[in-house]
């Protein structure tokens, strides 16, 4: 029939479980939805055209691998991790052309929002102090993924800590290539190529208003002049950005926003950023 299934595949308090080789093409709100599980393996999945998010991991989860999946053309984000999530590997995935222009609809999202209803990835965002955030994704290895042409950021970390981002290729995302935000700390980014991000080319007036930049107008090509960097450090601390290639981004290469404390940026190739310079804005290699 024409009815939309809420979730195509659900793992609920699962242990020692593998899900491999499925193709999910539309017909549901969420492709794969994992809740409070451990020792699970999701591999070689192709998830596209779902109404909301392709793959969600919610609640308390540990000891898992998301490997060689293709998450593409979904309508409101791709991979979404929310909760006390640890000791996992996210490797070799292709995360491409997913819609949704808000921060929490990035290609890969790590966040710490309190989960009032575990059946939805849209719990209300609280107004809370950073020191009250006690459950967020940590001790994850995010390696060798391609994150490209998403309508929001490539990777968005909201309070994630002690995570390792290694050898990822992150390009042509409409917002930042990577954003470490809202108390993210102690993360390590190395060997990544982060290029051609931050153009804000495909955003509606509603999207720009939500980011408080609609009043900046639009450039001749229809994009917003308020371009974004390859890597944004926003209310974050003790991160290491080492040995990456950060090039051809529309805003700055690496930008520290609001509070950015005791971060280490070294041995990176930061080349030909500021592609979106205009009469209104000029950007830099490293902007503090």
Give the location of each predicted region.
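Solenoidal tandem-repeat scaffolds enriched in leucines and small polar residues
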Residues: 73-142, 150-153, 158
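Core solenoid repeat modules with strong leucine/isoleucine-rich periodicity
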Residues: 169, 179-183, 229-230
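Structural detector of coil-to-beta-strand junctions
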Residues: 6-10, 30-33, 53-56, 77-78, ...
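Intrinsically disordered, low-complexity Ser/Thr- and acidic-rich flexible linkers and loops
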Residues: 101-103, 111-138, 199-228, 276-283
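Short "repeat-start/strand-capping" segments in structured domains, especially the N-termini
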Residues: 15-16, 37-41, 60-63, 84-87, ...
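Extracellular beta-strand-rich solenoid/capping regions of secreted or surface-exposed proteins
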Residues: 1-40, 53-60, 81-83, 233
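Predominantly extracellular beta-rich ligand-binding scaffolds that present long acidic/polar faces
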Residues: 264-269, 282, 286-288
